[in-house]
Amino acid sequence: MAREDLIEVEAKVKEILPNTKFIVELDNGHTVVAHVSGKIRIHNIRILPGDKVTVELSPYDLSRGRITYRKK
């Protein structure tokens, strides 16, 4: 069930942090700490530096996000 107020943006993975967190750079140049969504975790999709991903941001805290899709 998707939430209506989320902001979806494209980003590029810059760095991998512990506990499946990533530093991603948005298309507009901002940097965000993002974690992996449950579906990506269940299906063991590997995310590496340089990958293009889709990130969901909450309008309340724009410094954190959730990676929901990895581009091929």
UniProtKB/Swiss-Prot annotation:
GO cellular component, one term: cytosol
InterPro entries associated with the record: NA-bd_OB-fold, RNA-binding_domain_S1_IF1, S1_domain, TIF_IF1
Main location: cytoplasm
GO molecular function: ribosome binding; rRNA binding; translation initiation factor activity
Domain S1-like span(s) in chain numbering: 1-72
Pfam families xref list: eIF-1a
Subcellular location: Cytoplasm
Keywords from the named record: Cytoplasm, Initiation factor, Protein biosynthesis, RNA-binding, rRNA-binding
Function, in words: One of the essential components for the initiation of protein synthesis. Stabilizes the binding of IF-2 and IF-3 on the 30S subunit to which N-formylmethionyl-tRNA(fMet) subsequently binds. Helps modulate mRNA selection, yielding the 30S pre-initiation complex (PIC). Upon addition of the 50S ribosomal subunit IF-1, IF-2 and IF-3 are released leaving the mature 70S translation initiation complex.
Assembly notes: Component of the 30S ribosomal translation pre-initiation complex which assembles on the 30S ribosome in the order IF-2 and IF-3, IF-1 and N-formylmethionyl-tRNA(fMet); mRNA recruitment can occur at any time during PIC assembly.
Recorded family membership: Belongs to the IF-1 family.
PANTHER family to which the protein is assigned, alphabetical: TRANSLATION INITIATION FACTOR IF-1, CHLOROPLASTIC
Full protein name: Translation initiation factor IF-1
